[in-house]
Structure formats: C-alpha cells, structure tokens
Amino acid sequence: MSSKSSIQNIFKLSIPIFFANLVIPFVAIVDTGLMGNLDNASYLVATSIAASVFSILFGSFGFLRSGTVGMIAQADGSKDYEEIINIFLRNIAFVIIISLLLIILQTYIYNFSLSIFELSQETKLYFNDYFTFRIYSSFGELTIFVITGLFIGLQKTKTSSLIVGFYSIATVSYTHLTLPTRLMV
C-alpha cells in the first residue's frame, strides 16, 4: 500500500468517527436548549447540571468503545469471526452488569451529585426527573459504545457514525415528545 493510499484510508476511516464524536454531546445540548425555552430557569439549571453529571459518568465508560475496537480489530485481522461474536456478546453482558450496578447505586450517585451543587428545592425536583430518566437509559448509552466499537473495529466507521446519529436523534425526539408530560408530574 502506498503512502498516499494509506493516508487516504486513514481519512476515510477517521472522518466519520470525528463527526460521530461531534454528535455525542448533541443530546445534552438539545435537552438544555429545550429546557432553556421553558418559563422557569430551574428547568435549565437542573438539566445542565444533570447533563454534566452524565457526561462525566458515561464518559468514564469510554473504555467500552476503545476496548471493543481493539479486540474486534484483532479478531477481524485474524479472520476469527466466531471470536468477533464472542467479544461482542461478552461486552454486552458487561454493559448489562454495569447498567444494573448504576441503577442499584443510583441513590448514592444522585446524593453525591447533589452534594457538589447547591440547588433550590424546585431545581432538585427537576434534577431528579432528568437524573432518573438518564440513569435508566444507561443500558442504551453504554450499548452504543460497544456497538460503535464493533463497527469501528470492523473498519465500518460510516455505519458506526450513522448509529450514533440515529441514537442521538431518537433520544432528542423522545425528550421533545415527552417533555410536557414529564414536567407536569
């Protein structure tokens, strides 16, 4: 492979990943924007803080994507397709365990998050609503890491980017469609 075609291949693989990484904070930004258009600033404050908490929390599991990429790429290079399936299933099982632990530990995560910020009672109520919504989305959020790692490891970065984009749009749509009913509780 020539140096020029090698560089072209790198760009071909990396550009979709670059754009997918731009989409990842999209959900928190849009949720914050939706809350900012409501008549009460407490919505905006609560969503912004909770979005930051979950950016840090879910970001700490980025190893799921990078670890999946490395293992899948090795198995793909060896043409060991059974191992690719096994790696994917093991990582999904790990995601299930992590998600269940996050749900079990949600009270501690919630209380720790609130101990960092001084919030009014009203803001705490809205923080609780968004926090609960996001903690139960843990499985989906972390599964996306494994799925994108799978496709990046198989050098199908466009597919990986499309999945991230679709998931982000679906999450934003869900928030937009359910926002009025969730705030009236």
Q: What does each model-found stretch correspond to?
A:
Residues 25-45, 114-121, 177:
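Helix-terminus/linker motif at the lipid-water interface of multi-pass membrane proteins
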Residues 7-26, 53-60, 136, 162:
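Residue-level signal for short hydrophobic patches within transmembrane helices
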Residues 29, 146-150, 173:
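Alpha-helical transmembrane segments of multipass membrane proteins
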Residues 166-170:
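Transmembrane alpha-helical core residues of multi-pass small-molecule transporters
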Residues 44-104, 141-155, 159-160:
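Small-residue-rich hydrophobic transmembrane alpha-helices
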Residues 1-14, 72-139, 173, 177-183:
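Short alpha-helical transmembrane segments in multi-pass integral membrane proteins
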